[in-house]
């Protein structure tokens, strides 16, 4: 395990690759043509900004950014304060309520406090056109996030990967289960949560794993920045 490496160290070469340059150029061209793209440009890489490589303890894989106004801000499943909590995240809160004594469902869906504790909230595609789900799925983001997962697999040890749904599980096939702790369940979407996401106990199992390794468990109660100061 390499503890001092940063995202910049391991991704600098990847960001020079022609496919990645093309991805950024395509997104920029769409923005300049008047298309509304989510999240805003300044937020596209927030998952990496809030959770440095050497601090990654848990990875939660999402798929596409939210494509409604004001929702996406670069962290999978999370929405900005003041935005209604989306259905999948409500189901994550429901699972937390059912498995963690004392967990009280917050009135917001802002998960930055998870990210600061080492939970990488990574969408596998980092941008989307407003109102058009999966509209940027073929731009090259999947190649980039495959690389991110392989780098975590290589440079970290004992990371908990929470793989919810077929897309995340396929994406996580490269993870070495001897080096990391892989937990799988159906997606928390209302379409599939009742097929085994509810009752999966992943948040509790994650903390048990971290404590067994002598690491600080995650405080899964999301707090807004002003609440934690």
UniProtKB/Swiss-Prot annotation:
The active site is at 64 (proton acceptor). Its EC number is 3.2.2.27. Keywords: Cytoplasm, DNA damage, DNA repair, Hydrolase. It is found in: Cytoplasm. The keyword Hydrolase applies. The keyword Ligase does not apply. One of its GO terms (cellular component) is cytoplasm. It is an enzyme of class 3 (hydrolase). It comes from the Bacteria. It catalyses: Hydrolyzes single-stranded DNA or mismatched double-stranded DNA and polynucleotides, releasing free uracil. GO terms for biological process: base-excision repair, AP site formation via deaminated base removal. One of its GO terms (molecular function) is uracil DNA N-glycosylase activity. Its main location: cytoplasm. SMART domains: UDG, UreE_C. NCBIfam families: PRK05254.1-1, PRK05254.1-2, PRK05254.1-4, PRK05254.1-5, ung. Belongs to the uracil-DNA glycosylase (UDG) superfamily. UNG family. Excises uracil residues from the DNA which can arise as a result of misincorporation of dUMP residues by DNA polymerase or due to deamination of cytosine. This is Uracil-DNA glycosylase. It comes from Enterobacter sp. (strain 638).
């Amino acid at each position: 395990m390499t503890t001092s490496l940063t995202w910049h160290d391991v991704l600098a070469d990847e960001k020079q690759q022609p496919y990645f340059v093309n991805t950024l150029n395509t997104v920029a061209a769409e923005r300049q043509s008047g298309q509304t793209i989510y999240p805003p440009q300044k937020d596209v890489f927030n998952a990496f900004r809030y959770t440095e490589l050497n601090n990654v303890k848990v990875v939660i894989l999402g798929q596409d950014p939210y494509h409604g106004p004001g929702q996406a801000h670069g962290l999978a499943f999370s929405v900005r304060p003041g935005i209604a909590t989306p259905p999948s995240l409500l189901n994550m809160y429901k699972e937390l309520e059912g498995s963690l004594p004392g967990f009280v469902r917050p009135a917001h869906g802002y998960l930055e406090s998870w990210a600061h504790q080492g939970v990488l909230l990574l969408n596998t595609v980092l941008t989307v056109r407003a109102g058009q789900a999966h509209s940027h799925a073929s731009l090259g983001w999947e190649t980039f996030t495959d690389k991110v997962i392989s780098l975590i697999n290589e440079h970290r040890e004992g990371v908990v990967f929470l793989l919810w749904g077929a897309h995340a599980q396929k994406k996580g096939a490269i993870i070495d289960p001897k080096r990391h702790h892989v937990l799988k369940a159906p997606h928390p979407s209302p379409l599939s949560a009742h097929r085994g996401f509810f009752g999966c106990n992943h948040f509790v199992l994650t903390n048990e794993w971290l404590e067994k390794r002598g690491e600080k468990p995650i405080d899964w109660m999301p707090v807004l920045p002003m609440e934690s100061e």
